[in-house]
Each structure stands twice: as structure tokens, then as C-alpha cells.
């Protein structure tokens, strides 16, 4: 990798570099991009091309999330915009559909509301990309969102807390109620549902809520007095409510201080809805209502009616008799013309506005009817606020010079809004001071501001500009209007033609169809289309296989199985069956099984001992076996072949002597032999007997049978019908009425499906033969045949030789009783009514998890359908993650589409933070497929960029680490590079308890911390490594977990171990002396699997030779490179044979050697017994252990017959015997007995210096069987021979240990786990940078190899 160009600095602005960087971003992999950016230019992350795009912009556009996160960690500016369109990286990632990159940017603080040059934010881009089939209409199912100060509980959230942004009124969404109109007032709110029901909430004094009392309602409550009336419109003011029904009736309730209710005689208040009945309204159809604080307005197509306090807003003059209030509805005479046809009416506290179909707008105020505008055609909505009331009319409630200025808003079908204000007394069209065009679909008005809803579902809040403003503000307005791409010809006369409105976008409004506000502007409501409106990916439930499963149970029934509990012998055939299935379908069989063997009252059936499986055996007489088989087929499957049109039954109706031996004997007994028969032929005798038999049959035949002259005795359909009646199967008998046997085949004339009988746990409870027990102790008696037929899980459990099949105790299921009940109900009824009716999403998810575990596919699909119906903006991300985790594919697809359709709302609410990286990737792919325009948004890789083929996959990580450590000294930099080289080959950990992983053997580092002995390139072959019984393959080393990697740094801190290295003698490698290792103080003997420091060998030519063990600190220990190893091996080879000590014993350096290599070393040691007397050695060879029994999973402990204490004593004697002449210092040990208590291992970064200043590790040297750090001073000749008795004793000990381990109770294991966790907390093991603490169980000795034993053999 070449270094950056010499003329490149941190302020580089080279266009060539920018093009190279962007080219690599478009065509390189993530690691290649990282490597190139780290090496090509010092300013690669921020350098821009001619369009103002930098690497961050292109990475976001291409969806390279790994590079994006890498750049964010580098601290690049995330808010920088390009020159072309003013887009940030967030704009670009949304435009190209990379939601995973969007979420990374949002997590790092990028705002969604930053606008580009066209005034579009990132959310606006999502809105513009919405699929074309998504259109929001007033007729859609809608949800109510409210916000405001909520002083009087008018928002319906159940609390008095204020809301700063729109929040869902969840009462309606939970109940499936859709609202089409909301009216907000000071003390209460009114909600009208699409089904015509009225709900109110707020303060109830005066009866304004209409519930029959004056209690306050925190959440919306149904007005029961209007049940049975389909309401079409509501209006409300401060103290009363007006409701219009579809049939033109008007109901009012609330305070009637000003006679605004229109009820005669006028009550002071009315707390239930009462209909307005006036003679002026007879024969009139009211089409609309409106309400102000002091009055109520009704109108038809031809006239307007008002009632209430007459302060000038009723459209009539003062009463000359001094009547201040109009009690009954009175028509406005000023609007009583032949040509007037009313279309819209609105009212405020002090004014009334009427609109005709001709476009004339009239204002009723100050006891006058003024025409404010004309020819305003196609108006869809009109609003009014403010107004002045005559103070003298009611001084108690009115203030002198009170009221506000009148403002009228009108919206036409094209979305244009017109405004009339008493300030300028002219109707002006509104212009929006907003960077882009907006198209209005609904408006709302209060005394301070205007609220808008656009056709794209957005919400805005608008305010009038001040009359007096600075010149700079005027310039800003004009520039904003110019940017809105609208006609600017009005600018010269802007003050007189247009009303200027400054807009502010509402948050969390993305599907709005309607908006409303209270008159004071304190509380607001917005109706948004249901987020599932455009969802078409709906899960489907597969067809039922209920009867097919029971048919399979019947076909697989056998005399020897353990599922059937009754057998029927019909003729010479046996039919194994199941009592519960027969008894639940037939009262005959239910009584038979209740008789307990007493069959005297049953004809043609009796009990006979038991069958081969020990079940009850019943003999059925006078029934054809094939007929009984068809009967069983119908019982189990609700159908049979005789109900299939065109079926040709293959049934032998002629009596077989073998099958009906008893019947034949009875016929023979009836034959009369006379003396006259001696002279007759056999045929004549037979013919006479047949005639006699026929006559007897006719005599014995009942009279009722004479009617069925055309029923043949050989008709199989009638025979089956007779059998069905005999065994009380009326359903089959009635269905066979429409079946005929013609031309040797079945002809179905009329299909009679009948009523399908549902199974139930409560039916025939005396036949329950298995009990399920839930995890909370609740028991469910069940029937084994149903469980085995419906679920393979129970079939495998109860039909085999498992202990559950024969146990009389309840079967404990690790499932809660509520969930287990749903599972069992589904198995019996093939339905899940509880799931369909449940509103608890968590419960349904729990059932889905259990259904997935038990492989109940159809129940899982039912849960998916139920969860899809309960998808909301709050739980969509959670359900998507849940569906991905449990492979609920249909639910996942629905969640993906739901999130894609509501992407703007979910991004603004930050609801996607629960998604994992993989699920976010899937969401990005689905979102790009969902948007058709994404197919054209493809960034073509630049072809003219630099060649990056030389960059390897790992280069990005290498250069990242190099850049981080660039300012460190040279030695530390080289140290890091050596570490990354060692990390190039990935390591894998084995999950087994012992043995090596193949990748660990092949990819192990060339040096493990101690210098190799032997010849150059003397590396064991793979078979030798796998089959060697040397100390290196000792089971105590076991898994690769016990062999710490030299580059393993995270969380480990250990003291450094220093030892003196004697100068080379004749080019030989250094040999270490036991004197150089200082004994540690008070160090306990550690576990075998404790982390061990791995020494690293570095030769320092400028100072005295020394070796330092690797420290498990955040800085990785140095690793001996290949060149050093080759030099050492070369020096060894020059020296000749393996060096020997003056003791005549072989020096082992911890390398795992084969048996052949050990023999060669031993021979070399005997031959070369001189020349090395000046050297001191350290013996690191572990104690020899027998070969493990199982080569694939070797035991973690030694299987030697000697105890650990024997080894210590033996080693101590050996060291003592040579201490005088060898100058080898003894190493003290403190052994502890193995116990159940956990051991704590500390790897401290603060070592204890020895007398000579050397740091000694806290880790023991000889207690661990690790081949790198263990030693053995026992010569092979001193090992005692292994006897057969010791082997047998050892095997018995291992068997006993295995039994103890296997029968260890779960409670004890849990206690130990709690103890381990408590110790970890006590010793501050978590997040401790100074110490690495391990708490583990101590081993209890070797265990025998587990063996599978099959019972019953």
C-alpha cells in the first residue's frame, strides 16, 4: 500500500483526489474503501468534487453502512450539503432507500428537518416517494390524535397532562372505532364515529356531556341517549352540544342559560339529548347545524334558523318587547328569498356566516345581514371566528367593548383558501410563505392562527404576518414566495390582493385528512388515516387438516400400539379404535364404555377379555366388517367413500361360511330330514327348504318393512345406513338419505353436510387418560388419542417407549396455563377463539412462540393474522424483530410493508431503534423494492478511477489501526503491526469440552512464548498432532480456551515476568534457569483453565538478554516474528544436538512433541552429557498423563491413578535431591483441596517485585497442566508401572463421579450459579480495567464416558 502523495496535506482540495475517492466508493468493497481512504489522501473524508459531494455523500447513497459508521467515528461533518441540490447525507440515504444508513445517521444526531434548496426535508422525500396507490380520504378509517394544554380533560387521554405534539387517543384504536368529526370546546370535546355514534369527554356540570349525570369523564364515553340514531353531524360550544341525525332530527343537551337548546318550555339545563320540536321545522329537513356560545344555528336548503341570546348574531332585530333570547328556532328573514339555496353555514360566539350555492357569502352580525363576497363558487368549507355582541343585552355575561375582530375563512375545491378580516374588509386569497408549494385539503380556525391539512397528509400551522414589519422581513417574504414556484405577478400589488400566511409544519402528522381546534387555540385535534389502510400483505391461514389427521390416526392404529384403548372384532377382522372419539360422536358407545363390561342390555355386542395390548375387546355380531370400516371412516373423518359421487364399492355381500360359521350352523339345524326325502334329489330338497325359509322370513318380517318394497337387501348404502342407526349415528344416517346405489356405483342426489361435531376436553371426561400440568401448577385432563393425532410432538412422546407414555403422573409442560389452554383448545376444536378476541399483543406473541416450538403451523398462522390486525406505529418495529426471530414469514412481510408505508412517521418517532442490523438490512431491501422509482436510482460505478484490485479484504482494518496509532513511537507502531499480522488468520473456538479444533492446530502461531528445541522446520505433522499422547496433548490443556492467544488483549491484565537469559554459548539458543524465576508470595494454586500469560521472546542486543511474559493489558504483547524464529532455529542447528543440562535431563520448552520426537530427544540427551554446565535450565514439561479414553472429547483432567498430592511430593523430592548441586531454587506450592466452592482467578496488572527486581506473575507455574507453563522433574524411568487393579479402581471412581454429576439436582446448580454471580459482583469483575476476575467451578476429577443404554432390551 503506497503512502499518501507527498504534496497532499490535511487541507487537500485536489479535484483528482476527490474523483479517485468517489470512484473507489462506488465500486469497492467496504474494507477496500477504508484502506484506500486511509492511504490515498490526508483529507479523503471531506474532499469534494465539482458538485460538492464528498465521500460521506457517496457512501450514504451506495448503502455502505460499514464505511459510514467508520467515517462517523472519524468525526466527519454529517450536516454538510452538496452544491447541486443542498442535500445532506441523510437526504441521499433516504432518496436511495438505504434505511440502515438513515438510522445510523439519526442515531448520531442528524436532524430530519434540514431543508434542501427546494424546501424539502428528509421526511418530505419519504412523503414524496409514497406509492401511488396510497391516497388519504375522509372516508378512510381514521384515528384521532390530540394535543394541547388539556386543562379540562378535553384531549381524551385519561390524564390532565399537556401534550406538545399529536398523540393517539388509544381508546378508539383499541376498540376499533373510527372517528369522522371532532369538535373541541373549552370544557368538553365531542367525537362522532363513522358508525354514527357520539362520544364526549371533559367537564360534565350542566349536562354538556349528555350522559344523564354531571360527572367529569377523563376519556371519551358513549352518549347512550342517542343509541338507535345514526348521527351525521355534531356541533358544540362552551356549554351545550348539538347533534344532527341522518333523518334530519336535531338533539341538544347542556346548559340552557340563553335558551340555545331550542327546547320548549326552556329548562335551565338538560343532561340527556332531547329533540328540538318546533312548528317552524315541521316538514323541513335539517341538513346542517352550528353552535356558538350564546346561540345555535340550523339550516335547510332554503332557510336558516337561529335561537339563543340575540346580541346581533342571530340575523334578526331586537325584540320590541324586550325579549333578549329567542327560545324557538326562528328563520332569518334577510335570507328568505326564492333564489337562495344554502350550502354552508358557520357560527362563532359573536357572528354567523352563510354561503349560498351561487357563491354569495353573508355575515350575520350587529343585527345586520351583510353580503361579504360573491361568485365564490365551489366552496367546500367556511369558518368564522370572533365577533362583537351588544353589551346591553346581557351585562352579566358580556363585557363592554368585548369580543374580537371577525375573521372568515373559505376553502374551495381546488384547495385555495380565501380570507376576510375586519381589518381590511376585503376577501383576499391566502399565500403561503413556505419554500415549496402546498395543496390544502382541510382548514381549521381559532382566534390566533389557522391550521391546514394538505393532500399529502401533512399538517401545518399558519399565522398572519404583522401589519408593520421591517423592510428586511418584506424581502424575506418576497423571496419565499418566489421560491414557492407560484405566480409572482401579484408582487407589485401584494398588500391589497393577497393575505400572507407564514406556515410551520406540524410534527407527527403524515396521514392527516382533517383538523380542528378550539376557539381559543389551546387544544387541537387531527384525524389521520389508519396506518393499515393501504396494507395488502395480509397473512392467510392455511386450510384445516383436522379430519385428515384423525383419518391418519385411524389408518395407523394397530393392536400393538399404545394409543388405542379399545378393539372391535367384527367377523374375523379386528378394528383398533379410540374410546373418546367414538363416545363423543355416539351416545351408544358412550353408554357402552360406561357399562364397565356389563353388555347385557346391548344386543349383538359383548365384551371379550382383552386384546394383545391389554385393551378392551368387544365382539360385534350381525354387522358386515366392511360396513363397520366405513362407519369408523365417517366417525374419524366426517366423511366416507359412500358419500363420494361415483364411488364403486368393492364389497362382498354374500355370506362366507368361514366368516359366518355360527349363522351356517343355525341354518343346518333348521333343515328337516324326512323319510320321503330319500326318494328326492338333493336339488329338490334344497329348493323346498329355501321356500320354507322364505315363508318364515315373510312371517317374521315386521309390517313396517312392507313400505320399502324397492329397497334391495344387497344395497350397501342402505346396509350402512342401518348400521349407522344401530350405533346411533344420526348424522351419517341423514346424509345417506340423499345417496343412491345405482349401476354398481354411488350416486349423490342431495348433499346434506349436517352439523360437524366439535371435540371438547369437557366431554367424556371419564375417558381422560393423560394430564397436562402447566408451569404454574394448573392441570388439564386430556385424551391421548386427540393429542397424538393432532400434534407430532405428543405423538412422539406418548406413542413410544419414553417414560411419559407409561407414567401415571401429570406431564409437566414448561408453558403457562393461559397459553397451554389455548394450545389444547386448538388441538380439540381446530380454532383459537381466545387469540382472535384477545387485545393483548404480548399474549398472542407468547402463543406464537410456543406454536413455533411445537411446530403447530396453522395456529402460528392464526397468531400471525391476529398480530397483523393489531399492528400499530408503536409496536410495528418490535413485531418485525419478533417475526424475524421466530421465522413468522407472513407476519414479517406484513410488518415490512407496514413500516414501508409509514416510514416517515416511524423515522420521526424514532421507533426503529429496536431493530437489529440484519433486520434493518432486510427492511432496506424491501423498501427499495416497494418504491418503483428505486429501479432508476442506481449509481453506476466509475470506470476511470484508480485500480484497487491490489487491496485485500483485511486492508481496511490494518490501515485503520495504523492511522489510530500514527502518533505513537516507532517501537509501539511496529508492535501494533506485528499484532495485526498475527490477527490476519481468523481463529475459531471449539465448543467441545476437550480436544483441539482443526483450525486452531493449522493456524496456531509459530511461537507460543518459549523457544523451540529440535531441528529447523521440525514441526509435527497433523496426524502426529492429532494422535500424540505427549504432554502437549494432555487433556488438561483441553480446548483452545486454555491456550491463550498472543494477540488476545481485551480484558486481560497480568504482571510481567522477567528472567535472565544467559549469553549464547557457541551460537546456541538461550536456556533459562529456575533461579531466574522469583517465587511469588501468597499466590494460590489456580484452576487449570485459568488464563495464563504467554511469554514472548525478544533478543535485545544492546542490553542484557531477558525475556518478558506477555501482559494481558489493553496493549497486545509482542510476538516473535518468523525471522527471529528462523535465526534461533539456525543457531540451534549449528550447535548440533539439543543442548543438555548438567543434570543429564532433557530440556523441554513446552512444545507439544510426538512420541518419536521425545525418544530422539532422550537419546540425544544421553549421548551429549557435557558442554552446558554453565547454563541454568527451567523445566516446563508437564506431568505425563495416560491417553484419554475418547480421542474426540478428551477429559479435562488427568486420569492418572496418582493423586495430586503424590505428584507434588514426588516433584518436591526430586527438586530437593538436586538442589545442592544444581543451584536450582525451590518453588513453593500451596495446594488446596478440590471443592464445590467456586475459585476466583485474578490477573492483576500490579506485580510483586522479587529481591532482584524481577516481576513475577500471580499465576502458578507448576499447578496447571498447561504444556507451556507446567514442569515435571520426574524422569520417565521413575514412573511406577500401571497395574490392572489401579485401572479398575480408576474406572470405578470415574463411574461414581459420572453418577454424581448426572444426578446433581438443578436447585444446587442454580445455587452455585447465584454464588458465582455474587462473587463476580463482590470482586468487581465487570468493567474493571485493573483486574480480570474469573469465577468457575473446581473440577471433581475425571468422569467416565457417558453411554446410551436402551431400556427394555
UniProtKB/Swiss-Prot annotation:
PROSITE patterns: ANK_REP_REGION (PS50297), ANK_REPEAT (PS50088), BTB (PS50097), RCC1_3 (PS50012). The modification Phosphoserine is found at residues 990, 1004, 1030, 1033, 1039, 1045, 1054, 1083, 1111, 1113, 1116. Residues 976-988 have a biased composition (Basic residues). The keyword Repeat applies. One of its GO terms (biological process) is negative regulation of protein phosphorylation. Residues 992-1001 have a biased composition (Polar residues). It is a peripheral membrane protein. It is found in: Cytoplasm; Membrane. The keyword Cytoplasm applies. ANK repeats lie at residues 51-80, 85-114, 806-835. Interacts with the PH domain of BTK. Isoform 2 does not interact with BTK. Acts as an inhibitor of BTK tyrosine kinase activity, thereby playing a role in B-cell development. Down-regulates BTK kinase activity, leading to interference with BTK-mediated calcium mobilization and NF-kappa-B-driven transcription. This is Inhibitor of Bruton tyrosine kinase. It comes from Homo sapiens (Human). The lineage of its organism: Eukaryota, Metazoa, Chordata, Craniata, Vertebrata.
